[in-house]
């Protein structure tokens, strides 16, 4: 149960979410400001992407508390991200876990999350989510089916897992302004669990040749922008590992004619924020960290606050001067976040600092990691 001490929000969260932390069943976050008209006038669009949604047992318990004991409500948890997510033309999350049903929910090590997570993602403003992860087959084919069914009901698109071979063969394409954006997603492994029997297509596994082939197929089918989500890397490592760096170089070097096959790479899995880097002219986010997770313990068995730190990437794409050329990123930003495990809320750290919260050291640590591979020199800036 939620103890009295855990019902008391930390001061930094209270500063930001006094109105958003409503526990009523009909909680609706305030409507965010509309995107700047200038972006729409030029045909440009903004894309935001965030890290792992990883509901541990404590997160499930918190959502039940926020729902007043009747079901689960994850919307208050995500309310702090909504002012960044909802105004974007296209918003992508990473849904790390599969969903259970009828109260059969669990956290680590075999996750089965309440399907109400999908409703909260939609309410926050997410248009789609990558679903390929090391936990994709925690409950076999049934878990994949329940997850994608719930996302469909909520109106949230998905990429990376599939219920049928036909679904696996078709790229997820989303509209962002006047652009068609293909979203592809893959994971390095599934924690040693085999894919469902006779369903080798159920989870997208990282294979360089396959990723490039899928990106080219999506482009050939009419995608203006191709975004690839990769669940990769070494857990609890701030720096991208050698395999991440090598694969990023290879994927961003892939071209058809003079046009790169991939326009943006979004990384998850490490549990900690990792660097952003422009590689071969393409932005790569090695790792966005965990957007929602319980109190995290690292691979040394030690409570590690980095596991509740993350970023939202925000990229503005502008259309080419001539048809068939590349949509270019004209602005690249990152927004540092913290998940306040005591209050059960996502906190935008720069907004918290503006309101007087003493979280500058956490924000600065995230900033230093994000910029550690020279991204500032290529124009990456910190946003709110």
Task: Put a short name on every predicted segment.
Residues 2, 22-384:
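Acidic, metal/ion-coordinating pockets
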